[in-house]
């Protein structure tokens, strides 16, 4: 069963904390869920100059705290760029978010009740979301999928992780027939909850169709 369900869902509470942490009465539950979805979608659309890996939301009776895990491309690529373009203007972002929330949900949220905190990713090559999106970007640039995966595994496997598994599906390299290709290095035991498995999937949009990308990382 471990290979037929989302590995993240099985491990919440043991190795992972939930991406949304709050408690409310039943009558407000759906409203809070919709609000979380709106916040994540809004932030992902508005923040284009850095890579957003994860958005965590914590709420209590007094305030809402949003943790944005991000990667600054200029630091990762070690290229001197305009620093203003690679920074997140928290004040402006917070104002836009509150205006959108108040308008969409017809509520009045105080500016001081909302806190946005930035957490920079220290080691992006060990971030499963960055790995999957990096593969997606290269596939959309029509690079050979085997070269992409082999270089990805070579960069990761000696960085302190126990194993990695990558699965690609679709019309790979513009083939006439869709197929599935799997790559594994090290140990990725999906049938035990003792393993700290991080998982992410995304889709690459290419001229030959959509390509599915799944990445498992055993830390």
Curated annotation (Swiss-Prot):
InterPro entries reported for this sequence: KH_dom-like_a/b, KH_sf_prok-type, Ribosomal_S3_C_sf, Ribosomal_uS3_bac-typ, Ribosomal_uS3_C, Ribosomal_uS3_CS
Covalent S-S links between cysteines: none
Record GO terms (molecular function): RNA binding; structural constituent of ribosome
Compartmental location: Plastid
Any one cellular-component term (Gene Ontology): cytosolic small ribosomal subunit
GO terms of biological process kind: translation
Domain KH type-2, chain residue ranges per copy: 39-111
Subunit structure: Part of the 30S ribosomal subunit.
Family annotation (NCBIfam families): rpsC_bact (TIGR01009)
The protein's name in its UniProt record: Small ribosomal subunit protein uS3c
Gene that this sequence comes from: rps3
């Amino acid at each position: 069963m471990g290979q037929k369900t989302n590995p993240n869902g099985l491990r919440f509470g043991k190795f992972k904390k939930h991406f949304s942490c709050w408690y409310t009465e039943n009558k407000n539950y759906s409203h809070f869920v919709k609000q979380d979805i709106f916040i994540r979608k809004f932030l992902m659309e508005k923040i284009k100059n850095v890579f957003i890996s994860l958005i965590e939301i914590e709420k209590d009776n007094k305030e809402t705290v949003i943790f944005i895990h991000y990667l600054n491309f200029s630091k990762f690529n070690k290229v001197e760029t305009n620093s203003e373009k690679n920074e997140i203007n928290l004040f402006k972002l917070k104002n836009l978010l509150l205006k959108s929330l108040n308008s969409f949900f017809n509520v009045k949220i105080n500016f001081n009740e909302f806190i946005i905190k930035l957490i920079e990713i220290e080691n992006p090559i060990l971030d499963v979301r960055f790995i999957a999106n990096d593969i997606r970007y290269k596939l959309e640039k029509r690079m050979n999928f085997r070269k992409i995966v082999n270089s990805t595994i070579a960069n990761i496997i000696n960085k302190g992780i126990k194993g990695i598994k990558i699965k690609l599906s679709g019309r790979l390299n513009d083939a006439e027939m869709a197929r599935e290709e799997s790559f594994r290095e090290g140990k990725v035991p999906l049938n035990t909850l003792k393993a700290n498995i991080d998982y992410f999937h995304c889709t690459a949009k290419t001229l030959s169709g959509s390509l599915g990308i799944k990445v498992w990382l055993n830390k």
